[in-house]
A protein has these predicted regions:
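A contiguous active-site-proximal alpha/beta segment in oxidoreductase catalytic domains
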Residues: 122-181
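Short active-site oxyanion
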Residues: 41-45, 65, 90-92, 194-195, ...
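C-terminal helix-rich "cap/oligomerization" subdomain common to oxidoreductases
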Residues: 1-13, 91, 129, 312-343
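NAD(P)-dinucleotide binding in Rossmann-like oxidoreductases
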Residues: 228-235, 243-312, 318-327
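Conserved N-terminal Rossmann-fold NAD(P) cofactor-binding segment
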Residues: 51-85
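N-terminal Rossmann-like dinucleotide-binding module
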Residues: 1-63
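Beta-strand-loop-alpha-helix segment that lines the small-molecule cofactor/substrate pocket
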Residues: 91-147
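Rossmann-like dinucleotide-binding domain that binds NAD(P)(H)
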Residues: 182-257, 263, 327-330
């Protein structure tokens, strides 16, 4: 017997997966644009707080307005519940602010809807355990949308390191910088869910988690705080840590000129990956002086890989991703917790 998602048996790759989105903002627009290129997928519903935004989203992506849900008075809650209850929706792309992920992911899973949840999926390891428990209890797929793992460059990097050509990994450095400006998104200024570690640092943590086994130990964290109503948020982080004994230097900065790279130092050379959150270009520098450029373009765009992968998992009746597993989401949350709890 196949796995039942919503009201249909989806262990049949001839059946389209019918997606709905929770949150009709910029990220959902990017998801919807990529989904149009995915075989076996349809976007059939959208929910948000603002009626005008939901109406615009439905028009932009040819969604029947009967499946466009909005409720401004309760921060969108009635709209999100209505979409989750929609019998014509099989799977949900969860693009609400980070702090709302756990609640709405669990509600969707309990309703039998598969969930693709934007990064960071959770704000703590405790929240990760809660989602994993519900996913396993209900037998419904949950996957964190850690898009860099689904870019073709990611597999190339893993293959190169696994080949042993560069030897073992000696250390890793990540640098992520951008200028948030004076008026960033409101969730970035929320003391409970804002700051640059959650927003961009989670991408670097995703690389660390995937490349290195073993325990995480954070030796130091220097933070530049920004005062906001109700507290403060980290506007820059400089972290020294190790995983499995491999030293890591991690930099996130929301008040700097753009830079994004991951440098993996190995015994016989190094691998520098540009734009670590959406990688297409890397340089291999060998100890003998040779430098090789690796160019691995996206298939369609940087969202397509994760969206296509999730759709295929749902069609196949899988309960988790082999690329971004439930254990990986929990371990990423554990690493971020360790960083955040370092004085």
């Amino acid at each position: 017997m196949g796995v039942i998602v919503g009201d249909r048996d989806l262990c049949d790759d001839s059946r389209d997966v019918r997606w709905g989105v929770l949150g009709a903002g910029h990220i959902s627009h990017r998801f919807a644009s990529s989904l149009k290129e995915v075989d076996g997928a349809q976007l059939v519903a959208a929910a948000g707080r603002t009626p005008a935004h939901v109406e615009e989203f439905c028009r932009a992506f040819s969604i029947d307005t009967a499946h466009g849900y909005a409720s401004a008075d309760d921060n969108g809650c009635a709209a999100y519940d209505a979409l989750i209850a929609d019998p014509d929706v099989d799977a949900i792309y969860l693009a609400l602010p980070h702090g709302m992920h756990t609640h709405w992911a669990c509600r969707a899973l309990r309703a039998g809807k598969a969930v693709l949840c934007e990064k960071p999926a959770v704000l703590s390891e405790e929240e990760a355990h809660a989602i994993v428990s519900v996913s396993c209890e209900c037998g419904v797929l949950f996957m964190e949308a850690m898009k860099n793992r689904f870019c073709p460059m990611h597999a190339r990097v893993k293959d190169l390191l696994a080949s042993g050509e560069l030897g073992r990994v000696v250390s890793i450095e990540s640098v992520q910088k951008l200028d948030y400006g004076e008026s960033p998104s409101s969730y970035l200024l929320d003391p409970l869910q804002g700051g640059c570690l959650y927003d961009m640092g989670c991408y670097a943590v995703g690389w660390f988690e995937d490349l290195l086994a073993g325990a995480c130990d954070v030796s130091s964290r220097e933070v530049r705080w920004r005062d906001v109503p109700g507290g403060n948020v980290d506007w820059a982080d400089d972290v020294h840590m190790s995983i499995g004994g491999v030293p890591i230097h991690m930099v996130c900065d929301g008040m700097a000129e753009y830079e994004s790279r991951l440098t993996i130092i190995c015994e016989r050379g190094s691998l520098e990956i540009e734009r670590l959150h959406r990688p297409e270009l890397a340089h291999v520098k060998y100890s003998d002086g040779r430098v090789i450029e690796i160019d691995v373009p996206f298939e369609v765009d940087d969202f397509y890989g994760e969206v296509s992968h999730a759709t295929q998992l749902i069609q196949a009746g899988k309960l988790e991703s082999p690329v971004m597993s439930l254990a990986a989401t929990q371990r990423c949350a554990h690493i971020i917790d360790a960083i955040r709890m370092t004085p």
